[in-house]
Regions:
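Conserved ABC ATPase signature
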Residues: 145-149, 153, 395-399, 403
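Conserved ABC ATPase "signature" region
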Residues: 123-141, 373-391
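Helix N-cap at the start of a conserved alpha-helix in ABC-type nucleotide-binding domains
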Residues: 181-183, 431-433
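The feature captures the beta-strand-to-loop junction immediately N-terminal to the Walker
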Residues: 44-46, 299-301
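Conserved ABC transporter NBD signature motif
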Residues: 67-82, 322-330, 339
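Helix-to-loop junction immediately C-terminal to a conserved catalytic motif
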Residues: 59, 314
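Catalytic Walker B motif of ABC-type/P-loop ATPase nucleotide-binding domains
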Residues: 170-174, 420-424
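ABC ATPase C-loop
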Residues: 162-163, 413
Length: 468
């Protein structure tokens, strides 16, 4: 008879209030879950439903490091997690933002570090590091610093480090988010190898299009988990209502616009070359033009240089050679602040552009810095557009990933620039967040805004004006 890997009974958990005049934030009520050893389980839920919190609880990170009130039974490998955090050789965790768990000076050191803390012999460490690098296609990057990797490469590195440690249980918070098709295939193969060897896999996700229907599923909604069922047994309308993203059809709402090739250029590149200091060349003599009003997708695998390219459009990076022109002006002769009047930028990781104390202050900052007119009206409209009025005085840092993304979109709405650059805007979004983003893009496009979307999704050819 299989042993129980994870057992949760009548669990209730609330985070402490972020302000003295507020009530605790109740996340779970009467939660029940049972997973046997060597089983793979998928927890589906919308952004903010508590998927990440569930991983924190099972790893012993919450409430130990987060604070909060926990009642009920929570056992991992038959040990009470409330009494003792599970040791890393038993439980490994992949955070939703993999970059937060990378901290060493190189890719190979990142993989080796966890093995060293477990007391693995040096010769065995070398073998496991090389095997992990090969398994997750990181051999050519072994000496590179983790911060220099793309978002998808960082995700693969974090998974490679966990894979090398061979834990009995893996808690994987949206493990496929932000990965291109090759990266997803590598991750699936690595996880399947661990599962075949006897590991227990608990995955969370906010969408269904990347998962095998045979995997047992629990739906997390209204602070509780559903009964365990096969994914195909969950009606799509129920999933959509719960905020889960189903196989996307929303991109079909974008009909191709009339040809705008003869329109004046929004972005023009001439022999653009770029090389990071002490690093390899990334861009090699690029030439292309994006006319005003076009919807353009820049497509490529993780690490291909997509983010590096678009950061030239708003002056965050400057060419090593060649030129970039924005609205017919040489970008190298304009400051980042000046370019911000013409180009708004959505980072791949929303928390990188959130820094104010409240959501309202975050949306206000850009228009006020640029002395734009009607700042209060801009902020009010942006809050209303993304249903953020009730969160206007909350700190952005305490919001879920999907809501942080909505805040960043609200800031771009308030700026109302003629060019929008969005770096992997769909990564990590649940069904509601994806639908909200697509509606917003449709509105921007109808208003004549130039849209430049960086993506690893290869299925947009029929929906965009052009793919690069």
């Amino acid at each position: 008879m299989s042993k129980t890997a994870i057992s949760i009974k009548d669990l209730q958990f609330a985070y402490p209030p972020w302000s003295p005049d507020l009530e605790p934030a109740q996340i779970f009520e009467h939660l029940d879950l049972s997973i046997t050893q060597s089983e793979e389980r998928l927890i589906l839920g919308a952004s903010g439903s508590g998927k990440s919190t569930l991983c924190y609880l099972l790893a012993g990170l919450a409430p130990t490091y987060t604070g909060g009130t926990l009642t009920g039974e929570l056992r991992v490998l038959e040990q009470d997690v409330r009494a003792r955090c599970p040791p890393p050789q038993h439980v490994g965790v992949l955070f939703q933002d993999a970059a937060t768990q990378l901290f060493t000076s190189s890719v190979e050191h990142e993989i080796a570090w966890g093995l060293e803390t477990l007391g693995v012999p040096p010769t065995e460490i070398g073998f496991r590091v090389t095997a992990a690098l090969r398994k997750f296609d990181l051999l050519t990057m072994r000496t590179r610093p983790p911060w220099a990797l793309s978002g998808g490469q960082r995700k693969r590195l974090a998974l490679a480090a966990l894979w090398a440690q061979q834990p009995e249980i893996l808690l994987l918070d949206e493990p496929l988010a932000g990965l291109d098709p090759d990266g997803r295939a590598e991750v699936r193969a690595g996880l399947e190898q661990l599962r075949t060897a006897g590991a227990t896999l608990l995955k969370t996700d906010s969408h269904t299009d990347d998962d095998v229907p045979a995997v047992p599923v629990n739906l997390l909604e209204a602070k509780r988990l559903s009964e365990t069922v096969a994914l195909k047994a969950l009606p799509q309308q129920h999933l959509i209502k719960a905020g889960v993203r189903v196989p996307p059809k929303a991109w079909q709402a974008f009909a191709k616009s009339q040809s705008t090739i003869k329109a004046s250029p929004a972005i023009e590149l001439r022999q653009l070359r770029f090389k990071y200091q002490d690093g390899p060349a990334v861009l090699h003599g690029l030439d292309f033009l994006i006319p005003r009003g076009q919807f353009v997708a820049i497509v490529g695998s993780n690490g291909a240089g997509k983010s590096t390219l678009v950061r030239h459009f708003n002056g965050l990076l400057r060419p090593t050679r060649g030129s970039v022109r924005v609205l017919a002006q040489d970008a190298s002769r304009r400051s980042v602040g000046e370019l911000a009047r013409d180009v708004s930028f959505l980072f791949q990781r929303p928390e990188r552009q959130l820094f104010a104390n409240t959501v309202r202050e975050e949306i206000t900052y850009g228009p006020r810095q640029l002395n734009l007119p009607n700042v209060e009206d801009r902020v009010a409209r942006s809050l209303a557009r993304f249903d953020l009025e009730s969160l206007a005085d909350r700190p952005p840092a305490l919001l879920s990933y999907g809501i942080q993304r909505a805040v960043t979109l609200a800031t771009l709405t308030a700026m109302d620039t003629p060019i929008l650059v969005l770096d992997e805007p769909l990564a990590g979004l649940d069904g509601r967040g994806r639908a909200q983003l697509l509606r917003w893009l449709a509105e921007r496009r109808a208003a004549g805004i130039t849209l430049i979307v960086v993506t690893y999704e290869m299925k947009l050819e029929a929906q965009v004006d052009r793919m690069i």
